């Protein structure tokens, strides 16, 4: 994820309170500016945590050969399928947490012309990544892909002139079978050293046998068919908003692969989200100023949720993950951002929590 930096010529003014908090889901006053530098300060968002679901599946595709009906007659190959088939296997499901801007959690760092110039790093969607520090690059999410593990072979390239000129399918099949038997005989003669044209050395013999094997495989496929295999990666996003016990996210069919939730041809895959309520209850100091600071740095103290992805008979994912939306917003007081200190802050692009806080006294 790219980030852009804003170097400002004004000082940062925050409220005097070092720490305070308010519910993460509470509605906030949003300054009507786009994220970035404004006349009043720096407008930024805090993130909501989404789940990038990565589904991996293996597909086996069978295509019958044009001479499948004659496989037993000419090659003595029994039980050859004459109809195409496609078989899918759900191999794995992974979760990749990511952050996306929460438009309801927008804040502005107000500036004072008497304070020092900070360096602020924002994500492209406006989420705050760093103050007075260089934010590291965000890891890219897995993208959909298809990887073929079995190459397709073309049988047409090994058809002889007699096969091409044959008037009916049965004759073509008979000629193809005879060509297979001829290739097998030639292989045996080469191995025994009795061929009409013997190879000069071992390497030439290897190449000749390899060519015969390729031709026999292609011709045999015209009777017994071809099987190809490939690995598919599907991805989609899910943003938890509350506890759910068994929310159906997609279906998977042995014959169709990944299908929509309303397609009853597939079996359902569910997600369970359970807030662990790991954050302690907020305690208020009766002597503290009840007025909430409005111009200091906000960050999220995320909550923890248990995430499960499962079917009726298998669990694919069972993880504890930090989610911004299950936490609350905290304040980093303005006392840390004045001319006495050089404060550097790194925030998580996924949850908005403070990953690193460096504090140096000016002049040291």
Language-model features: where?
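Positively charged n-region of N-terminal signal peptides that target proteins for export
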Residues: 1-7
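N-terminal amphipathic/basic membrane-interacting segments and domains
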Residues: 27-364
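Hydrophobic helical h-region of N-terminal Sec-dependent signal peptides
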Residues: 9-18
